[in-house]
A protein has these predicted regions:
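Short, surface-exposed recognition loops or helix-turn segments adjacent to catalytic cores
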Residues: 152-157, 222-224
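Active-site beta-strand termini and strand-to-loop segments that position acidic
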Residues: 55-56, 168-169, 362-364
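Helix-turn-helix
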Residues: 50
């Protein structure tokens, strides 16, 4: 599993995104507003979705977005706001970042809500790959609603690309984070590591923590470093959405460990198998996981071929000794090396952050393959763990 590319989306999810008819300026503007609204939602088991109801005169009647599991979906949110304001939605259009759902979960199907509201024109960016929710477009067309798709598809895919991948693979999308010196050390010989990274790198990492669903470390990291694993601002205070704090390993977590925090949002995974850990996290609604260390857990995920994205903060520092970023990956010859390529998405492949470099990589495509399937190397079974 790796991040989807726009060339493969049609095959992967059956979307008509890249065969869509042209859209006018008003429709484009509405989709941009819907994308901006979607970005306000919380990440997790559900995708980020935004919707804008457009009147027959082209004005935006209401903008909605999904605020999390159990709350109104974006379409229902926008329709509800428009109705509360006394708007007549008969003949109106709705522009949505994801195909309207067609199932009854905690909330009713959005396709039916659109039909009931009298909306006659639906534009959405990409198809919903989640089988229970898919099929809204078919229902809408059967009811006589005009349906078009593909507007701003690339932007909509980028907004939820990790969620799309997680749904397709039925496991969390895994971002592996390493903060290291030029000689690949994550701590000095005496165990000190705060801080190898620049303040700018630390701030970037905390911003990333605020966008993920969960952060994972091993029990050894908890016992030695006693991390908080929260998303914090420049003053060191927890700020914004906080990720689930997960710990992997058999050893117990002290009651006074900082990781417990005030909210106690901690999950202890009593396993050393990365695949088992991912299964448990997926069952808890985690779709985007960041693995932070230490070296054993980083190496275990890499050796198992379960890393979809690498973010490396490289400090212009040399130690010569100390804790290496990675342990043995079971690779004995160059031909079996794990190959990675630069990923220009989400901030760029290479960024300068203060004195550091931020490197963003994804698994390289298999050189002998004509498709874009990532090259998975290393053992197929987990090794190590904390």
């Amino acid at each position: 599993m790796s991040a989807l590319n726009t060339a493969g989306v049609s095959a992967a999810f059956g979307t008509a995104a890249f065969h869509a008819a042209a859209f006018n300026a008003a429709e484009n503007a509405a989709m941009q507003a819907a994308l901006a609204a979607a970005a306000q939602g919380p990440r997790g088991a559900n995708p980020l979705v935004g919707a804008v109801v457009v009147g027959t005169d082209g004005t935006h009647l209401a903008t909605g977005y999904h605020r999390g599991a159990g709350t109104a979906h974006a379409e229902a949110d926008a329709i509800g706001q428009a109705k509360a304001a006394g708007r007549d939605l008969r003949g109106a259009a709705i522009v949505v970042t994801l195909e309207p759902c067609n199932h009854c979960g905690r909330t009713g199907p959005c396709a039916q809500a659109i039909i009931d509201a009298g909306i006659t024109d639906v534009i959405y960016a990409v198809d919903d790959p989640h089988d229970p929710a898919a099929g809204g477009a078919v229902t809408l067309r059967a009811a006589g609603v005009r349906v078009r798709s593909g507007l701003a598809a690339e932007a909509a895919l980028d907004l939820n690309r990790r969620w799309f991948d997680a749904v397709a693979a039925k496991r969390p999308f895994v971002t592996l984070h390493i903060a290291q010196t030029l000689d690949s050390r994550i701590a000095a010989s005496d165990g000190t590591s705060q801080w190898i990274s620049s303040p700018e790198s630390l701030a970037d990492n905390h911003a990333l923590r605020g966008r993920i669903d969960a952060i994972l470390v091993g029990t050894q990291t908890v016992l030695i470093d006693n991390p908080r694993l929260t998303a914090r601002n420049a003053d060191g205070e927890a700020e914004g959405k906080q990720p689930l704090r997960a710990v992997m390993g058999y050893r117990g977590i002290p009651d006074d460990a900082a990781i417990h925090g005030a909210d106690g949002n901690v999950l202890h995974l009593a396993t050393r198998d990365p695949r088992e850990a991912l299964d448990q996290l997926f069952a808890h609604g985690v779709r985007h996981l960041m693995v932070e260390g230490g070296s054993r857990i980083l190496s275990a995920f890499l050796a198992a071929g379960l890393v979809d994205e690498l973010i490396v903060y490289l400090a212009p520092t040399l130690l010569g000794s100390g804790t290496a970023a990675l342990d043995d990956l079971g690779i004995t010859t160059l031909a079996d090396a794990q190959r990675w390529e630069w990923d220009p998405a989400s901030g760029g492949a290479v960024q300068v952050l203060g004195r550091d470099l931020r490197l963003h990589l994804r698994p390289a495509a298999t050189p002998t393959s004509s498709d874009t399937t990532p090259h998975r190397t290393g053992a197929d079974t987990a090794a190590g763990g904390n």
